[in-house]
């Protein structure tokens, strides 16, 4: 529903329509599936033929020690959604923030349409940063890891719902 959503966040996911069965889902997760950007984009376009509006911007978080969803899936999502946004796969901005690798991809108008966070030392979990500072939050648990980066906070910044506090 690209007409309903301006942006979204993916936590250790696979590209849209990377699988159409449970078995294919496991293959996509554990082994990864590589396709040309055009093929990935076609899977999105075929979902709503004739749609001419803007597609949602994405922010993607993936642990660099994830053994459940292969790291290459993040790159495949980048291929899919940079193609959807008619931009290239070369990051326009990269850096290390709070020890994690960050990349941003801009469209022809300079808007950030895809962002990636490779979370150092994290497996298949949600990145939290317990604490009381403005950029901290969340609790550690079975599916949440203290990564020194609160993914919900950075998602809200990406979606322009809040301004960066520090």
Task: Locate predicted features.
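Stable alpha-helical elements in mature extracytoplasmic
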Residues: 1-4, 40, 73-77, 148-155
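Hydrophobic/aromatic-lined pockets within catalytic cores
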Residues: 2, 82, 86, 160
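Residue-level detector of short, conserved catalytic/binding motifs and their immediate flanks
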Residues: 6, 56-58, 153
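Second-shell loop/turn segments in exported
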Residues: 8, 64-68, 141-145
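The feature captures the conserved acid-bearing segment of alpha/beta-hydrolase catalytic domains
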Residues: 16-127
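Catalytic active-site module of serine/aspartate enzymes centered on a nucleophile-bearing elbow/loop
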Residues: 133-166
């Amino acid at each position: 529903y690209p007409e309903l959503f301006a942006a979204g966040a993916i936590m250790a996911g696979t590209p849209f329509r990377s699988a159409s069965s449970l078995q294919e889902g496991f293959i996509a997760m554990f082994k990864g599936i590589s396709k040309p950007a055009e093929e990935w984009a076609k899977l999105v376009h075929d979902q709503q033929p004739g749609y001419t509006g803007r597609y949602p911007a994405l922010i993607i978080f993936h642990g660099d020690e994830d053994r459940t969803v292969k790291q290459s899936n993040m790159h495949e999502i980048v291929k899919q959604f940079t193609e959807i946004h008619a931009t290239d796969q070369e990051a326009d901005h990269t850096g290390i923030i709070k020890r994690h690798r960050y990349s941003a991809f801009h469209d022809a108008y300079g808007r950030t349409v895809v962002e990636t966070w490779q979370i150092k030392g994290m497996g298949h979990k949600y990145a939290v940063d317990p604490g009381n500072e403005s950029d901290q939050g969340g609790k550690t648990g079975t599916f949440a890891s203290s990564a020194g980066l609160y993914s919900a906070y950075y998602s809200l910044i990406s979606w322009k719902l809040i301004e960066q506090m520090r």
